Amino acid sequence: GLPFTQQMTFPCELTLRTTAEGVRIFRWPIDGIRKLYKKSHAFTDMTTVSEANEALSEITADLVDMSITFKPIADAIITFKVRGLDITYGNSTEFPNKDGDMVTVPSVEFDNIEDEKPAIKIPAPTVDGAVSLRLLLDRMSLEMFVNGGAYAAASYCIPTTDRIEFSVSKGDVLQVDSLVVNELRSIWKEEYAENDGTAPEVTDLNAKDVSMQWEKNLPYLEEAYISAQ
């Protein structure tokens, strides 16, 4: 097998910030992603899973930038099912503290697409009693940012639906302080966007046409990337 997955992540800024654990590097998507927003859905002060799922029921999203701030529930697993992918909160992982000692902290995780490998976990401690989680979901890519970028992870994935829904292992209570779901448009121009944003398949017969399409779209892609900086 190859030593890489060919996954491409969205451009991010790395910043140094002083935290209770000392100086840390934060990773956060560049603001240019806002140029790709085509529709936004915002909700606040929801108190049950039923309420959250009702709010989400009308949203069908292919490309997603979702942010949620919620209050954890003791001894309960919270599952955010985004396009068929389970992102769970409520288990734990080990992470070094400011003294370098390994400590147990709450985690957020999702299954590794390679079945023989363990789930991908990152720390997700509470800040003032709440956890903030941001998910960027492309057609075959998932990026996760916790507490403003204090912790981050990325992996390739295979979404199976266009829906978003939540669940809790105990009861129906779920305090969601804020939830924002931004639907994203494709970076490709209309020729590709109408084909679900994917480039046409390359064959011996159409290789020349595909090459011309790439040349036609290259200035647009370069402009989009530069404007996102």
Where in this protein do the model-derived segments appear?
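Beta-rich accessory regions
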Residues: 1-228
